[in-house]
Amino acid sequence: KINIALLTGHLSQKEKNEIYQQLENGQIDIIIGTHALFQEKVQYNQLGLVITDEQHRFGVEQRKALKDKGNKVDFLVMTATPIPRTLAISLYGDMDVSTIKTLPNGRKKVITKFIKGTSMKPILKDLKDYLLKGGQCYVVCPLVNESEAITGRNASDISKAMAQYFKGQYEVGLVHGQMSDEEKNKIMNAFKENKIQILVSTTVIEVGVDVSNANMMVIYNAERFGLSQLHQLRGRVGRSKEQGYCYLLSEATHSEQKERL
């Protein structure tokens, strides 16, 4: 029998202590977890293999911290975010780097368009036509609420405006990091079941979301997101044989921002 356990920061201290003890005694064969796996207090009986997904979220020091917890530990690290070869060598110089350039069978490359400004008017017809065909759409904003310190469209206002505009035609949902896990799960499940056709959100959807019927994404103030975030966000669409579309709305003026987009 293979024993599998989960270690995250959400567990109670009692649950964590039980897992720590079982790991040290070799009673757990496979441990799945978050950054909690790097902690000093976590000791492994005989760590031999580490598989890291979303590697761009972890640093070199964190990888070393895990490596030091075993003897001759094998590593497999994965990321969907393209990393320039020179950067890859500096980050993973001690590892073999392989790049998969082909898409999964039947998948199409996501069509990405840059739209100058922060108005949805230039793409409104495309959005309506897409929704009319039965598709679902993500609308991503950099802020939850209006901010005096930071400029950018906020999810709360955008969701209200879209709900008013599409009233009686399509359901609009809102999800962001300030919601409880229960609230977020309720909205995400409604979106998966197509009870919500337009999901307005912040970056909480950038990982772990897979809705094959949602193949259009609109990103407001795209210049406010990093390259890895943009790749992760865009990765939410085009996850089926249907064509995916990603619209980057931006008033970017700096050359670096424009290059990134």
PLM regions: where:
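Inter-lobe coupling/hinge segments of SF2-like helicase ATPases
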Residues: 1-260
